[in-house]
């Protein structure tokens, strides 16, 4: 047998991190041939202490029964399947001694008399219980005992019965009157045994109890009265409006009313008849309910009534915009109260707002009652399309949100203006973050920035650069040639695409004619950098071969001039 392992606290321990640790231990157990910490046993405790969380196969853990339990020390073993052997039935609850019956009473065993069990005590009718009505089997040192002493059942006692004028009572005892004792009244006789008084009322009363604790007499004592007189009538919970005298004469009428909180059933006026009789039959005053409580923002039925009899009901309903919480009706109880508790009317609430706002967020109020407002806010760079808020409103009998979720669209710049003699190239769109490019038509050069970006300043989207200008390309006159001329203007400024023509000068007075060598017409164009150039070199004017004198040759001397210089703007 393996030696016992030192096992620290009874399980579970404060040092075990609860469910998280338990889950981790279960996970680890599936990967190792070990047992986890054994479950905590309510009836036994380990004899040694350990901080280990895992135990090798074959480990023995020793236990002893806890106070309140009996049994021999035992061990549980970690088996090959990583499960501990069962500790069931190793310890049994100790039993308290059989509880004695109280004097004149009984002890009731509810289930058993073992540790933690409870018993009840009771007394028969006519007796009251002195002491505790229950006891529990608890630990005391190494044993178990009942936590309360056995009570006593005392007989319920009544006080002396009431005395009557012109009469007396008879009973088994004139000093001790226990529960159930009966006394009988009789009237005194006159001289020579003559009957001069009439016994009115119940001749016998007995000792009883309403709460099984205090003894009371079953009713009022009778009276011995002179014939053709009536004693004051008694109506429980009633008040005699007429003079309250000891005797009333024949045919005399008295009036009753009920105490507050009670309602009258029967006639309010009765008349004294022969033999101490009151006619008609005396009324009764039964407990009634006052008008039920008013509920804020609610209507109820039977508002015109001042008193309600037991069993009567009133119904509540809430005003539009409110929900009723509690019972819709109350009923008047025999005790003069309303049951159940009055309801309340709470402001209606809308359901949780579940809509989502892509590229934005929803701002919720503290509550969702009628009038609550949910705000919609777009992220930076986006603008709201739709309602900026939704309100909880009343629609018939329902509370609803009055608008749906809007859309957060990306903010856009204004449509960019097209430069004169230029173009705008939108690459994707004109939303914030997008770029556009500018270009000029042929014959024009771009002055300014060739691109712009849609940016955000505060809440406004605008283009980062002003639109450029497309300026027309102008160049000076083409080169002059000897013995020739061109059609350019004296001031120059030849626009793009303009053509100029060359001709040779005639010299008839000298008998010379020049020939134009090259292109007679050249045109204004541009090179890739936007600079103006002529389409070809300027032509030249030459004499025919062998023609003219030496002077003529000088005049017609060959000059090769190229018009390839740039036209800068």
UniProtKB/Swiss-Prot annotation:
Q: Where in the cell is it found?
A: Cytoplasm; Membrane; Secreted
InterPro entries cross-referenced by the UniProt entry: Compl-Cell_Adhes-Reg (IPR050350), Sushi/SCR/CCP_sf (IPR035976), Sushi_SCR_CCP_dom (IPR000436)
Say yes or no: keyword Disulfide bond present. yes
Tissue spec. comment: Expressed in fetal liver and to a lesser extent in fetal spleen and thymus. Expression appears to be limited to hematopoietic and fetal lymphoid tissue.
Q: Which family is annotated?
A: Belongs to the receptors of complement activation (RCA) family.
Q: How does it assemble?
A: Interacts with iC4 (methylamine-treated C4) but not for iC3 (methylamine-treated C3).
- Its protein name is Complement component receptor 1-like protein
């Amino acid at each position: 047998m393996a030696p016992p392992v030192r096992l620290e606290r009874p399980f579970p321990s404060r040092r075990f991190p609860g469910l998280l640790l338990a889950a981790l231990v279960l996970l680890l157990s599936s990967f190792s041939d070990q047992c986890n910490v054994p479950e905590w046993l309510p009836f036994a405790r380990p004899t040694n202490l350990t901080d280990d969380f895992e135990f090798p196969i074959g480990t023995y853990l020793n236990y002893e029964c806890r106070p309140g339990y009996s049994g021999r020390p035992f061990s549980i073993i970690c088996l090959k399947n990583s499960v501990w052997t069962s500790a069931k039935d190793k310890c049994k609850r100790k039993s308290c001694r059989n509880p004695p019956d109280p004097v004149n009473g009984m002890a009731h065993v509810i289930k058993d008399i073992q540790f933690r069990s409870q018993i009840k005590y009771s007394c028969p009718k006519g007796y009251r219980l002195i002491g505790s009505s229950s006891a529990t089997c608890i630990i005391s040192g190494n044993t178990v005992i009942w936590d309360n002493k056995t009570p006593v059942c005392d007989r319920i006692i009544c006080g002396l019965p009431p005395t009557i004028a012109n009469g007396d009572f008879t009973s088994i005892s004139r000093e001790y009157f226990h529960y159930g004792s009966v006394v009988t009244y009789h009237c005194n006789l006159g001289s020579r045994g003559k009957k001069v008084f009439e016994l009115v009322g119940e001749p016998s009363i007995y000792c009883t109890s309403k709460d099984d604790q205090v003894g009371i007499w079953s009713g009022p004592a009778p009276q011995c009265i002179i014939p053709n007189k009536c004693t004051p009538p008694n109506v429980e919970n009633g008040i005699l409006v007429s003079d309250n005298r000891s005797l009333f004469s024949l045919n005399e009428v008295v009036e009753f009313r009920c105490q507050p909180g009670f309602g009258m059933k029967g006639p309010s006026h009765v008349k004294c008849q022969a033999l101490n009789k009151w006619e008609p039959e005396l009324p009764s005053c039964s407990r009634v309910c006052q008008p039920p409580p008013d509920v804020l923002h609610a209507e109820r039925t039977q508002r015109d009534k001042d008193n309600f009899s037991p069993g009567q009901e009133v119904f509540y309903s809430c005003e539009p915009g409110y929900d009723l919480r509690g019972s819709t009706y109350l009923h008047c109880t025999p005790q003069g109260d309303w049951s159940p508790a009055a309801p309340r009317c709470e402001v209606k609430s809308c359901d949780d707002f579940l809509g989502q706002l892509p590229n934005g967020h929803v701002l919720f109020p503290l509550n969702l009652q009628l009038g609550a407002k949910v705000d919609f806010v777009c992220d930076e760079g986006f603008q709201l399309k739709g309602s900026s808020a939704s309100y909880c409103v009343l629609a018939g009998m329902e509370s609803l949100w009055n608008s749906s979720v809007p859309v957060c669209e990306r903010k856009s710049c204004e449509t960019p203006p097209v430069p004169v003699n230029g173009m705008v190239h939108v690459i994707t769109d004109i939303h914030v973050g997008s770029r556009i490019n500018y270009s000029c038509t042929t014959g024009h050069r771009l002055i300014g920035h060739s691109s712009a970006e849609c940016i955000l300043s505060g809440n406004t989207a605008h283009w980062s650069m002003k639109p450029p200008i497309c300026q027309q390309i102008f160049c000076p006159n083409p080169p002059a040639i000897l013995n020739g001329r061109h059609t350019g203007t004296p001031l120059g400024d030849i626009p793009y695409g303009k053509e100029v023509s060359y001709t040779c000068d005639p010299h008839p007075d000298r008998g010379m004619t020049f020939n134009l060598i090259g292109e007679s017409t050249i045109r204004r164009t541009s090179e890739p950098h936007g600079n103006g150039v002529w389409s070809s070199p300027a032509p030249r004017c030459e004499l025919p071969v062998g023609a003219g004198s030496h002077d003529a040759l000088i005049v017609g001397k060959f000059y090769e001039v190229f018009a390839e210089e740039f036209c800068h703007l």
